[in-house]
């Protein structure tokens, strides 16, 4: 005090303060297992070793959140992933089942389509066959017409029999109601042959026979009151099934 110097009651006050040294700072960091950041302010500043100052330390520790050890929270956390997996599994199973049903439906529709195509092909074949048969029928009709001949469809039946001709039944008009075959013979002139009236298109049943003794001489006449038709006689007995000869005049 006499020398004008300050006296410290503590012998350690004259030296460097350990609380503000870097060693203490690192010691605190090493002792603290958690990472921390700190700021400090030394007040008041002054010349070295001739003043005292106070260090204020502010530490901010970054600590992780406390994990709860509650059994209910752990179980609920575990159940959520299991529930999600179960839902995903069920969804995938539904998708697979739907895809399988769609594949089955596609196969069924393909089978039905094939059946319809076969039916259409069969119908087309039947139509082609009908067309072919129609053409064949027309060809056969043309050949028949060519063999019979054109109108009036007359041609000789037997060449060695005189006054004998074959006449197509439809050479006469079909609207002739009553046709009478008359001859001059034993039954008298103007008598009806067999007293039978015939339709115009029923020449196959015509039994108009001439006198056998008058073959080539006297020819009976068939008349319907409008026109006159000459019936050719023959000296040979007619048998059933042989053509009856008649000639239109």
Swiss-Prot record:
Chief localization class? nucleus
- Region named Leucine-zipper: 102-116
User: Per the entry, what induces it?
Assistant: Induced by zinc deficiency.
Write out the annotated subcellular location. Answer: Nucleus
One GO cellular component term, please give it.
nucleus
Summary of the knockout phenotype: No visible phenotype under normal growth conditions. Mutant seedlings grown under normal conditions accumulate reduced levels of zinc in roots. Mutant seedlings grown in zinc-depleted medium have reduced root length.
CDD domains of this UniProt entry? bZIP (cd14686)
Q: Where is the bZIP domain?
A: 74-121
Which GO annotations describe the biological process of this protein? DNA-templated transcription; response to zinc ion
For this protein, the record's Pfam families field holds: bZIP_2
Q: Which GO terms describe its molecular function?
A: DNA binding; DNA-binding transcription factor activity
Give the region (Basic motif) as residue ranges.
Answer: 78-98
Region of interest (Disordered), ranges: 66-90
- Keywords, alphabetical: DNA-binding, Nucleus, Transcription, Transcription regulation
Out of the domains of life, which is the source?
Eukaryota
Q: What does this protein do?
A: Transcription factor involved in the response to zinc ion deficiency. Binds to the consensus sequence 5'-[AG]TGTCGACA[CT]-3' also called zinc deficiency response element (ZDRE). The ZDRE sequence is conserved in the plant kingdom and present in the promoters of genes that constitute the primary response to zinc deficiency, comprising additional ZIP metal transporter genes. Required for zinc accumulation in roots. Mediates the expression of the zinc transporter ZIP12 during growth in zinc-deficient conditions. ZIP12 transporter is involved in zinc uptake in roots.
Name listed for the protein in its UniProt record: Basic leucine zipper 23
Q: Which organism is it from?
A: Arabidopsis thaliana
């Amino acid at each position: 005090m006499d020398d004008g110097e300050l006296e410290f009651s503590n012998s350690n006050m004259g030296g460097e303060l350990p609380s503000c040294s870097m060693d203490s700072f690192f010691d605190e960091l090493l002792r603290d297992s958690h990472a921390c950041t700190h700021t400090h302010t030394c007040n008041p500043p002054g010349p070295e070793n001739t003043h005292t100052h106070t260090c204020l330390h502010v530490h901010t520790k970054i600590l992780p959140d406390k994990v709860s050890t509650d059994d209910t929270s752990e179980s609920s956390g575990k159940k959520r992933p299991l529930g999600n997996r179960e839902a995903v599994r069920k969804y995938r199973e539904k998708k697979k089942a739907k895809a399988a049903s769609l594949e089955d439906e596609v196969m069924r529709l393909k089978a039905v389509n094939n059946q319809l195509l076969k039916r259409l092909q069969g119908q087309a074949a039947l139509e082609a066959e009908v067309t072919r048969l129609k053409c064949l029928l027309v060809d056969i009709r043309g050949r028949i017409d060519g063999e019979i001949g054109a109108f009036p469809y007359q041609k000789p039946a037997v060449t060695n029999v005189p006054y004998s001709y074959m006449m197509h039944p439809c050479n006469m008009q079909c609207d002739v109601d009553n046709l009478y075959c008359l001859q001059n013979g034993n039954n008298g002139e103007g008598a009806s042959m067999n007293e039978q009236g015939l339709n115009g298109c029923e020449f196959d049943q015509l039994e108009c026979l001439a006198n056998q003794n008058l073959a080539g001489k006297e020819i009976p006449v068939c008349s319907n009151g409008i026109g006159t038709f000459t019936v050719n006689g023959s000296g040979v007995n007619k048998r059933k099934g042989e053509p009856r000869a008649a000639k239109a005049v």
